[in-house]
Amino acid sequence: MAIGMSELKKGLKIELGGVPYRIVEYQHVKPGKGAAFVRAKIKSFLDGKVIEKTFHAGDKCEEPNLVEKTMQYLYHDGDTYQFMDIESYEQIALNDSQVGEASKWMLDGMQVQVLLHNDKAISVDVPQVVALKIVETAPNFKGDTSSASKKPATLETGAVVQVPFHVLEGEIIKVNTETEEYLEKVK
């Protein structure tokens, strides 16, 4: 199905030259003279590169053949990550470039969304909020009560986030995976 210029918006998935992209940012421009156009920044699902593209009135782009599947992350083995389709129990192996930044939030057994383009896995999305255990952080000292103060904490997946001083090693916290920020302790 063709997508017209007027339908473009942030987050929309499009295909140009056989490559699937996500619109990261767009701006509708209406110059004093001439026809309106859309200037957009689009990110490739295949290599992660962001390019700027201008769409003119009448331009069309295709809707990509993308399928999102819920899969279970099994384990990491060298340079591959093993996933299992929770419906068919079929296993697939993805490399570092396919998994990307999601790897620092993934725990064995976690359910993730794997994006497939023409039946080939191209990216992995983790939940926006995950609960992870702190394996290393500096101890608290008396007087560390300033609410704005933060300290680095290493999580069980190896990711490092800034946490308030009252958070201790061994505690489980919720983290926003998009902003990489501490949200709260898990009770």
Swiss-Prot record:
It comes from the Bacteria. It is found in: Cytoplasm. GO terms for biological process: peptide biosynthetic process. InterPro entries: Elong-fact-P_C, NA-bd_OB-fold, Rib_uL2_dom2, Transl_elong_fac_P/YeiP, Transl_elong_KOW-like, Transl_elong_P/YeiP_cen, Transl_elong_P/YeiP_CS, Transl_elongation_fac_P. Its main location: cytoplasm. Involved in peptide bond synthesis. Stimulates efficient translation and peptide-bond synthesis on native or reconstituted 70S ribosomes in vitro. Probably functions indirectly by altering the affinity of the ribosome for aminoacyl-tRNA, thus increasing their reactivity as acceptors for peptidyl transferase. This is Elongation factor P. It comes from Helicobacter pylori (strain G27).
